[in-house]
Design a protein with these regions (language model features):
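A residue-level marker of the well-folded mature domains of exported/periplasmic proteins
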Residues: 1-302
Length: 302
């Protein structure tokens, strides 16, 4: 990719609160420098601040850049602004999360993990380890699913990919499965609810995206007698699992411990995998994603 002009891009991310976003920023900065383009990379203080992100997107449109990058916190909240950008002739490139239902033609490309498939991958690796424990359990077993929200495409699909694949694998082994907890995940999963399930998928979503609330969700799941595993669908949830476990010390891969699996990396998660607190994590390529955003913005501007 080569830039035909010294373009300026506006990029609206989900924030800077995780090392993941710092890595995306690094990739974008390096590629912008290589191509001779400039960018303004912004994001809200918290991934709960949807209204702030919409305001940032409106400001980005008013700056009249060659193109805009957007990692949408909500699949619905940005639609009016996306229509405005389209009317102004400013192409939008999605990253990290897509914007399903965006006004037609407003989002020209998307740089993201296949989040549903990534959730399925986490489930496949997890089920391999849990299979014997499910078979040996006399009663029901509970698998916790921690999602930081029920609004962004990436978080929802990583959760649903995990839920649907665990259910598929468990049902293939002859078990009944149900999903309980957060309504969005219960309704959107492929699992038919049943009262007498062998495998319970229990979805916890905090009222706001804070480390404290998610750590409390983790502790609630760890304190349920039938919990055998917890899955966190991003860096926020994975780190909250580590924090929530500090006083309880229930996570691990021993027979009487709760298996912890998560998403993304970062110092805390890598250390937790290394010391055995977490069994493993599915990681993305955030630096490459940042570079890909700049490439796609440049191609759109060209």
């Amino acid at each position: 990719v080569e830039a035909k002009e010294a373009y300026h891009f506006e990029i609206v991310s989900k924030g800077f609160q995780h090392q993941y976003w710092q890595a995306v920023l690094k990739g974008a900065q390096e590629e912008a420098e290589r191509l001779g383009v400039t960018m303004n990379f912004v994001g809200p203080n918290s991934e709960s601040d949807i209204a702030d992100q919409v305001q940032m997107l409106n400001s980005a449109i008013n700056a009249k850049p060659a193109a805009i990058g957007l990692a949408a916190l909500s699949t619905d909240a940005c639609n009016d602004a996306l229509q405005q950008a389209k009317d102004a002739g400013i192409p939008i490139v999605g990253f990290d999360s897509g914007v399903p239902g965006a006004p037609e033609g407003s989002v020209v490309a998307n740089a993201a993990t296949d989040n549903y498939a990534a959730g399925e991958l986490a489930a496949e690796k997890t089920y391999e380890v849990l299979k014997d424990r499910i078979a040996a359990a006399e009663g029901s077993v509970r698998i916790g699913v921690m999602g930081q929200d029920a609004t962004s495409e990436s978080i929802i699909n990583r959760g649903l990919g995990f839920i649907d694949k665990i259910a598929e694998l468990a049902e293939a082994d002859g078990y009944t499965v149900t999903v309980e907890g957060n309504d969005k995940y219960v309704q959107d999963s492929k699992v038919e609810p049943t009262d007498d399930a062998k495998v319970i998928l229990d979805v916890a979503v905090p009222s706001q995206v804070t480390a404290e609330l998610s750590a409390t969700d983790c502790q609630t799941l760890l304190n349920k007698d039938d919990t055998i595993c917890i899955y966190g669908s991003n860096q926020h949830s994975g780190e909250a699992m580590v924090t929530g476990n500090e006083n309880l010390q229930k996570l691990g891969s021993g027979e009487d411990q709760v298996l912890g699996v998560t998403f993304d990396s970062g110092t805390v998660i890598k250390e937790a995998v290394k010391n055995g607190t977490l069994y493993g994590a599915v990681t993305q390529a955030p630096v490459a994603m940042g570079a890909a955003v700049i490439d796609l913005l440049t191609m759109a501007a060209n």
